[in-house]
Regions:
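Fungal secretory targeting signals
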Residues: 1-20
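Metal-dependent phosphoester/phosphodiester hydrolase catalytic core
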Residues: 18-520
Length: 520
């Protein structure tokens, strides 16, 4: 009896891996309230028990080495609707993404719900029809494009709970190595497009050159995404960095390049559908297929001029929920947007105990460290909202104002110090918004409000704390990367009045800033 018991336990463990191997069931983290109840998901899809670490299947074929059949969607019903993507590369692993979906679209498929149910209730059955047939997807990673030298492979399930998205971590890879990958519907010839990705160098590896493409601000109705496609076709970079505003939430009436939904987006379905529309752009799809992406969000992934407690068009009052938000609160809207973002983007679970964390760092050998910040949504003090701009100008130097919150700020400063001490030559900082002081009086400012208080200029104490960290520890070779303004800015990083800076030679500066124009 003992061998049989071991076999059954092995089946159970494999079945668990097939479900939990799809990171999106727990995204953005395994233990906070945006994750799904796996007990309910498993029960609905044919599993009789969930004990936390083991699944006991009604059908042993679910967990055998062969392709599962009973209760699963037929391969002929499914399509890889939005290509493939990879992201958040490490020296030994990378995130792989795809979507394997039937041709259905349900604008009621909101996992976050309305009414008097608890805020974090994710039970779907009470509100919408959901599929009881999961999709089984396998993946393989190879050193050659013919997929003949597979070095990592696995299987994962997906379902309507997570918009049929699949996100897995391919492990056991070698540093600074190019790989090819492909998904397929289990037990069939229904395959995804072939993707390509690349791991990062080992932290102490000597690397002479790493090429990155840096993007921000891509608004689908306002132009084609040629910038993505040109770099992909030239094929002369290693990775892609996106600094935010990957989508825009606005209502649009564009007929030449319509986006779905056409109204301003608020619900989980809205955000899923909007990202899905963007991913139909062939240049964007090609870039995702060719390169590993590292992304963060700015404001428009959720809503314009976002901060900790609201947005320019929606605040934390019941009247605003009803008048401006289609009955959707600030917290609800943020949950919807964050969940859709983690479902659709090739991004890792960053922190298992942090509801909104996207800030993280990457090491590219001894050449540079990349620090990706969230200067927008995590714990930002109030920003300019249109009606309060002059008031915010009066607060520019207030010591308590922060773009990041104390937790992220302290982490950021520690990252700078650790990077310098480990001997990394450069530090790249993805900060979304422009860091350097810019007088915008002749642009769209005024004599009374001469600075863009929605950028770092509106949070002078936070800027000064950043510069103080750099100067106190002698941390130079810092490169700030920014988007948001839709304009190109290049400047030295200088703590004015605290350093002997020469604008002719650049001496006294601790780095430079490159703020790029928009994709569209």
């Amino acid at each position: 009896m003992k061998p049989a018991l071991v076999t059954l336990c092995s089946f159970a463990a494999l079945a668990t891996a097939d479900w939990t191997g799809n990171i999106n069931y727990g995204s953005p983290s395994l233990s906070h309230n945006l994750g799904l109840s796996m007990k309910k998901v498993l029960k609905r899809h044919g599993h009789s028990d969930w004990s936390g670490s083991h699944v006991h299947s009604k059908d042993a074929s679910y967990s055998s080495g062969e392709a599962p059949t009973a209760g699963f969607m037929e391969a002929s019903m499914l399509n890889f609707t939005h290509g493939v993507a990879s992201g958040d590369p490490y020296p030994d692993s990378v995130i792989l993404w795809t979507r394997a979906s039937p041709n259905v679209d349900n604008n009621e498929s909101n996992a976050t719900v309305q009414g008097t149910v608890p805020l974090y209730n994710h039970e779907l059955l009470e509100y919408v029809y959901t599929s009881t047939s999961p999709v089984c997807v396998s993946y393989a990673v190879s050193t050659d494009r013919n997929m003949s030298s597979v070095v990592s492979s696995g299987r994962a399930y997906t379902s309507s709970d997570i918009d049929y998205t699949v996100k897995v971590e391919a492990k056991g890879l070698k540093p600074w190595t190019q790989y090819y990958y492909q998904f397929s519907i289990c037990g069939s010839d229904n395959k995804s497009p072939l993707g390509r990705t690349k791991t990062t160098p080992w932290r102490h590896q000597d690397v002479d050159e790493v090429s990155v493409a840096v993007y921000s601000c891509s608004n689908f109705p306002y132009g084609f995404f040629n910038a993505y496609g040109n770099v992909a076709r030239k094929d002369n970079v290693d990775y892609v960095i996106h600094l935010g505003d990957y989508i825009y939430e606005y209502e649009t009436s564009s007929q030449s390049r319509p986006v779905e939904p056409q109204r301003e987006i608020f619900t989980l379905y809205d955000y899923r559908r909007r990202i899905a529309t963007y991913r139909t752009d062939q240049d964007l799809a090609l870039s995702h297929q060719q390169f590993a992406w590292i992304t963060t969000w700015d404001d428009h992934e959720i809503a314009n001029n976002g901060y900790r407690d609201g947005f320019s068009g929606l605040n934390n009052t019941e009247d605003s929920f009803e008048e401006d938000g289609m009955g959707v609160s600030v917290d609800q809207r943020k949950m919807n947007a964050v969940r859709a973002y983690f479902e659709w983007m090739p991004i890792r679970q960053v922190d298992m105990d942090n509801n909104l964390r996207i800030w993280r760092s990457f090491q590219f050998g001894s050449l540079f460290d990349l620090v990706m910040l969230d200067t927008r949504n995590y714990d930002r003090s109030i920003t300019t909202l249109g009606w309060n701009d002059h008031y915010i100008t009066e607060l520019l130097n207030h010591a308590g104002r922060t773009l990041m919150g104390s937790l992220q700020e302290n982490w950021f400063y520690n990252q700078l110090v650790k990077s310098f001490r480990r001997g990394a030559t450069w530090r790249l900082i993805g900060s979304q918004i422009v860091f350097s002081r810019v007088n915008i009086t002749t642009w769209f400012g005024s004599e009374e409000d001469p600075y863009n208080a929605d950028a770092w200029d509106g949070y002078m104490a936070n800027k000064n704390r950043t510069l103080k960290t750099m100067y106190d520890h002698g941390i130079d070779n810092n490169i700030m990367l920014a988007g948001d303004s839709h304009l190109n800015w290049v400047s030295d990083l200088v703590w004015l009045d605290h350093s002997n800076y020469s604008s002719q030679t650049g001496s006294g500066a601790v780095g430079v800033e490159f703020a790029g124009a928009a994709v569209s």
